[in-house]
Amino acid sequence: MYRALTRDIEVTVEPFYLAEQSDPEDSRYVWGYRVVIVNQSNVAVRLINRYWHITDQNGQVDEVSGPGVIGEQPRLAPGESFEYSSGCPLDTPSGIMFGRYEMETDDAETFDVAIPAFSLDTPDLRRVLN
């Protein structure tokens, strides 16, 4: 699991390889990831936008942004959490993702919350250390 805490908003990400949706012979590798956002602050916040920076093992970068997550702009009161799952296809057997959520308070103050960097590695990927 990967965690980041920004202004008492905790974001936890757990990636997992989806072998049944992947086809290595066709250079298609697919991961899912589960995100849990916990509002540990004393004010309500709404997730209004997302931004992802995705890099495959060849250095190819893909940037994804848009309103909310999975079609929602969830509002989290103090102490509440929101969980969702999504996915990411790559043409290579490994990569890395990180990003941010734009949050808004009930007073219309906006701020960014970090999504921690997390690795996307196929289970059979061998690491070579020199």
From Swiss-Prot:
Pfam families: DUF525. InterPro entries: ApaG-like, ApaG_domain, ApaG_sf, Uncharacterised_ApaG. Signal peptide: none annotated. It comes from the Bacteria. Residues 3-127 form the ApaG domain. HAMAP family: ApaG. NCBIfam families: PRK05461.1. This is Protein ApaG. It comes from Allorhizobium ampelinum (strain ATCC BAA-846 / DSM 112012 / S4) (Agrobacterium vitis (strain S4)). The lineage of its organism: Bacteria, Pseudomonadati, Pseudomonadota, Alphaproteobacteria, Hyphomicrobiales.
